[in-house]
């Protein structure tokens, strides 16, 4: 089972690929897709999808999992995040991948044991749980690893 974890965002999206072979988890790759707020939104969404498409074609995941969205007090921010999520879900559908969503607190609790963990705690635990992740310093990237990890350890596939 190969899972693509995505921490959805328009400005700085984290992605990670984690595999489960027998009972062992294996970190394969991760990264961050950054877009500029100066660019038009349709160009930003297209760029995000073009990078994620390359990841899908290279690693051939069986499933994609994304963090559920909470409603932000700023409706414009929520709407833009909704655009990003919709574009990502469309890409996932185009490649006929199964998809799961997890609440942020579920991800935090699975990775750290505490549902209200801070970003640095998630980053620290990911490095302990998955060999190969020591070089990760970006919290969006770490969140994406945590999302994929949550899917695999909760056997939600």
Swiss-Prot record:
Sites where the protein binds Mg(2+) 1: 7, 140
GO BP: any one term: DNA recombination
InterPro entries registered for this protein in UniProt: RNaseH-like_sf, RNaseH_sf, X-over_junc_endoDNase_Mg_BS, X-over_junc_endoDNase_RuvC
What does the cofactor section's free text say about binding?
Binds 2 Mg(2+) ion per subunit.
Pfam families annotated for this entry? RuvC
GO CC aspect terms: cytoplasm; Holliday junction resolvase complex
Q: What is this protein called?
A: Crossover junction endodeoxyribonuclease RuvC
Source organism phylogeny: Bacteria, Pseudomonadati, Pseudomonadota, Alphaproteobacteria, Rickettsiales
């Amino acid at each position: 089972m190969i899972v693509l974890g995505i921490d959805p965002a328009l400005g700085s999206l984290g992605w990670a690929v984690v595999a489960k072979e027998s009972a062992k988890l294996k970190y394969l790759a991760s990264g961050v897709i950054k877009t500029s707020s100066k660019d038009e939104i349709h160009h930003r969404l297209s760029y995000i999808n073009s990078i994620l498409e390359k990841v899908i074609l290279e690693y051939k995941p069986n499933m994609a999992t994304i963090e559920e969205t909470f409603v932000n007090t700023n409706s414009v921010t929520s709407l833009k995040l909704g655009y990003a999520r919709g574009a990502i879900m469309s890409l996932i559908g185009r490649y006929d991948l199964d998809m799961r969503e997890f609440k942020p607190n579920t991800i935090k609790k699975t990775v750290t044991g505490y549902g209200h963990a801070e970003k640095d705690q998630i980053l620290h635990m990911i490095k302990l749980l998955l060999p190969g992740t020591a070089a990760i310093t970006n919290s969006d990237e770490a969140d994406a690893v945590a999302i994929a990890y949550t899917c695999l350890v909760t056997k939600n596939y």
